[in-house]
From Swiss-Prot:
Pfam families in the cross-refs: B3 (PF02362)
Tissue: Specifically expressed in the reproductive meristem.
Gene Ontology MF, one: DNA binding
Function: May play a role in flower development.
Residue stretches in coiled coil: none
Protein name: B3 domain-containing protein REM1
This protein's UniProt keywords: DNA-binding, Nucleus, Repeat, Transcription, Transcription regulation
Compositional bias per record (Acidic residues), positions renumbered to this chain: 91-125
Region annotated Disordered, chain positions: 87-135
Domain of life: Eukaryota
GO BP term, example: flower development
Keyword Nuclease included in the entry's annotation: no
Lineage: Eukaryota, Viridiplantae, Streptophyta, Embryophyta, Tracheophyta
UniProt organism field: Brassica oleracea var. botrytis (Cauliflower)
Gene Ontology CC entries for this record: nucleus
Length: 497
């Protein structure tokens, strides 16, 4: 797979009649004359021509089919090669309505806006939920911030009203602040303060910082504040996937601090937390088609701290002890590495009742020779964030005895494709005898496998047809160019004669 351009994920605001400009690197733009766009609204792959880095022929039709509305925040994600997945941010409407007055205090047009009112900061929260630095200099605190569509679109991070900077100019003039990632790379941003609310906000570089460090909409990131130099510094300690679980507090240990105090609005905890080993993923239609489950290397401290530095074999495991051999491929640029699981995960989801558009939680276990990703729980649709009920878990567990060819605790099933559940399986299955697999079940499994193979073949067939058309067009252009050169040569020869 071709490494993704930088950035591999970005957002644009849809305007009727406007042709969006893709924020891609020069290398990608110079080597491509078109892109292939996909969305959840249609199974069709749309070929859209590029005019430089601007979407041209075919974009209007794609926008019409997907019913994009004026002002929608569109999220572009590179899926490899020329394919980009386009979706409407689910929070774009809410954020635009909630933060309408924020634009009045946005300082990107001129410096005089710094003193205007910012209604979104009146609640003392902003985009962060956090932190007050203790007077004791030996006590360190985290800044817990959430990446929202508004913060990416406006290139601005609103901080909690309770958060203070000792080095900020007493006359409330904007100053510079450094954001430093875990590799030591530094970004210079602007720190300003709203006079009416007293809340701080960071701008002019926040979106670039998120893109370079793999931070996407819904993620939570944790910073440690340092004011030992001439300018305040926020050190990125970790970040975790959000996906609507704002109450999940599995903060990771910051490598920069010896004694940490993880703070929130409700108070502080002196306990250290180990790196998060849990990854929240969504089973999207595009991932079903490509068979690739993308995971950011920064989406979990456990993934980064586990020592996974290159591609290799992994094992997928569910709560019933069933195993699927798989492969983890790592790619991307330093500071924005990401990886994807290539095979086995769709079969694991199917066996555990995880359907398209469902979310699920994977737990990373590195006790064996190969890393293990364990399916920890399923999350219901529509963003409710509820874990699948025990009744449904029991119903899914019954399918264990009917799933052919799956390894359970190192043992294979019988010759007829049946499997046996170990003593460590769900207590619901204790004492149950293995049941025979019916012919209809086996036929259904084979049929599903054939359908999966057909979908994959159709996907690559569409890509091959597109490439074939491009090559044919190139041949025609070369023929026309040859005729022009021949004509010019004849004219020159006649003039010389």
């Amino acid at each position: 797979m071709v490494p993704p351009p930088q950035p591999s994920l970005f957002q644009l605001t849809f305007l009727t009649g406007d042709k969006p400009i893709l924020t891609l690197d020069d290398e990608f733009i110079s080597s491509h004359t078109k892109v292939l766009l996909i969305s959840d609204a249609s199974d069709k792959i749309w070929e859209v021509k590029l005019d430089g880095n601007r979407l041209a022929g075919g974009w209007e039709e794609f926008a019409a089919v997907n019913n994009f509305s004026e002002g929608n925040v569109l999220v572009f994600r590179h899926n490899g090669e020329e394919i980009f997945h386009v979706a409407v941010s689910s929070e774009s409407d809410d954020d635009e309505s909630d933060d309408t007055d924020d634009s009045e205090s946005d300082d990107e047009s001129n410096d005089t806006d710094d003193s205007e009112s910012d209604d979104s900061e009146d609640n003392g929260e902003g985009d962060s939920s956090l932190v007050n630095k203790e007077a004791d200099s030996s006590s360190d605190c985290f800044l817990r911030a959430r990446v929202t569509p508004y913060s990416l679109t406006k290139d601005r991070l609103d901080l909690s009203k309770d958060f203070k900077f000792m080095l900020f100019d007493e006359h409330n003039k904007p100053c510079e602040i450094y954001l430093v990632n875990e590799k030591g790379r530094k970004w210079t941003l602007r720190l300003s303060r709203n006079i009416s609310s007293g809340a701080f906000y960071i701008t002019r570089g926040w979106a670039n910082f998120c893109s370079a460090n793999g931070l996407i909409r819904g993620d939570f990131c944790y910073f440690k504040l340092s004011e030992s130099g001439e300018r305040p510094v926020l050190l990125l300690c970790s970040h975790e996937s959000g996906n609507g679980h704002e109450d999940k507090e599995e903060e990771e240990e910051c490598p920069e601090a010896d004694t940490l105090k993880i703070c929130s609005v409700g108070g502080c905890s002196n306990e250290k937390n180990t790196p998060s080993r849990f990854l929240t993923q969504k089973f999207t239609p595009s991932r079903f088609k490509t068979g690739q489950l993308y995971i950011s290397m920064l989406s979990s401290g456990g993934l980064r701290e586990s020592g996974i530095k290159k591609t290799g074999e992994i094992i997928l495991l569910d709560n019933d002890g069933r195993k699927w051999p798989s492969y983890l491929n790592k790619t991307g640029q330093p500071g924005g590495e990401w990886c994807y699981i290539r095979k086995g995960w769709r079969e694991m989801c199917e066996a555990n009742g995880v359907e398209v558009n469902d979310s699920f939680v994977l737990e990373l276990i590195c006790e064996a020779a190969n890393p293990i990703f364990k399916l920890h729980s399923k999350i219901r649709n529509k963003g409710k964030g509820n874990i699948v009920t025990s009744k449904k878990r029991a119903l899914h567990a019954r399918t264990v005895e009917r799933t052919p060819g799956v390894e359970i605790d190192g043992e294979r099933g019988s010759k007829r494709g049946c499997t046996r559940v170990s003593n460590r399986s769900n207590t619901y299955l204790k004492g149950k005898q293995p049941e025979s697999c019916s012919v209809s079940d086996q036929v259904a499994n084979v049929r599903q496998s054939v359908l999966d193979t057909l979908n994959t073949i159709r996907h690559f067939k569409a890509e091959l047809k597109t490439r074939e058309r491009n090559l044919e067009a190139s041949l025609l252009e070369l023929d026309a160019l040859g005729e022009r050169i021949l004509g010019i040569s004849k004219i020159l020869n006649n003039n010389l004669a």
